[in-house]
Amino acid sequence: MMRRTLLHSFATLLLSLSLWSAAVMAAVTTQVTVVTNVAGALVTETTIWDPATAAAAATTTAQTGFFTTVFTTTNDVGTTVTLTQTVNRATMLPTTTTSTSSTGKTTTTVPTATSSLSSGLYLSTVTTTNDLGTTVTLTQTFTHSSTSATSSASSSVSSSVSSSGSSSSVKTTTSTGSAVAETGTRPDPSTDFTEPPVSAVTSLSIDSYITITEGTTSTYTTTRAPTSMWVTVVRQGNTITVQTTFVQRFSSQYVTVASPSVGSIGMGTLTGTVGVIKSAIKKTVSHNEAQHLGMSSFTSILGGLLTVLIWFL
């Protein structure tokens, strides 16, 4: 009798432990991560893991099954955005993308996705609408090798923006290749990379000016094209090239003025300011000679006569 009671108690304990472990495994796990972006704003990322959904996805076949990923985040203006994406296990491409936000914007998109399992080429296009009502299209092309984990990868990302109330230009970034080992003293951008700021960090003009002064009469200014800096990084096997524009400030400025004052004209030497032409020839008369020109001539003749008379005497 005692033995039967002990066996019954042991079985009850095992059943309770199994039910408790099942309840723990079935519990939904939520992970909250708070990071600071390059603009200095706090960004909260919430990841929800549901074991029941994972178990249901694991029971399906790898060729026809789907799994769903949910991302919830809060941007720097306080808008909560939830992105739900359904991925096909056969092609590992998204089939449906749904985005919702706290401002009431909801978009469900079926992306255009093609794949070639023989060559391992995947193409995915996702179109969504942000909180401002602007339609954004993201196209990604990448390669994947099932035999080598360190295969080369190429990435082509283009983003186009269009809306009824605004217009903007289209920017395209394309890169192909792999990272090159850094052998100098600078940090390797593939492992130590700082994100460029999303907005301007200075009020200086992007254009650089050159001022040229010729003598004291002609001054003109020319402009040069903006200077761009390219940074290449490798993330998860994809090579990404980022372009940014920078402005450099100089602490001092040097000015050189060429103004010659002496020059040679072959038969003689010209002194004074080069390039100045006088409108008339002028003569300067000194010692008040202009008023006593006749007296000057009489004095000269009288001096000559006295000299001849003294010679005869």
Curated annotation (Swiss-Prot):
* Processing after translation: Extensively modified; probably through addition of O-linked mannose residues. The GPI-anchor is attached to the protein in the endoplasmic reticulum and serves to target the protein to the cell surface. There, the glucosamine-inositol phospholipid moiety is cleaved off and the GPI-modified mannoprotein is covalently attached via its lipidless GPI glycan remnant to the 1,6-beta-glucan of the outer cell wall layer.
Any single GO BP term: fungal-type cell wall organization
Q: Where is the composition biased (Low complexity)?
A: 147-181
Arranged from A to Z, the UniProt key words for this protein are: Cell membrane, Cell wall, Cell wall biogenesis/degradation, Glycoprotein, GPI-anchor, Lipoprotein, Membrane, Repeat, Secreted, Signal
A GO MF annotation of the entry reads: structural constituent of cell wall
Q: Quote the subcellular location field of this record.
A: Cell membrane; Secreted, Cell wall
sequence repeats sit at 72-86, 127-141
The answer on whether this UniProt entry bears the keyword Ligase reads no
State if DNA damage is listed as a keyword: no
In this chain, the stretch annotated as Disordered covers: 94-114, 147-198
One GO cellular component assignment for this chain's record is: plasma membrane
InterPro entries attached to this UniProt entry: Kre1
- Region: 2 X approximate repeats; residue ranges are 72-141
Q: Which residues form the signal peptide?
A: 1-26
Extra remark: Present with 623 molecules/cell in log phase SD medium.
Described purpose of this protein according to its UniProt entry: Involved in a late stage of cell wall 1,6-beta-glucan synthesis and assembly. Has a structural, rather than enzymic, function within cell wall 1,6-beta-glucan assembly and architecture, possibly by being involved in covalently cross-linking 1,6-beta-glucans to other cell wall components such as 1,3-beta-glucan, chitin and certain mannoproteins. Acts as the plasma membrane receptor for the yeast K1 viral toxin.
* Designated name of the protein: Protein KRE1
Q: What organism does the record attribute this protein to?
A: Saccharomyces cerevisiae (strain ATCC 204508 / S288c)
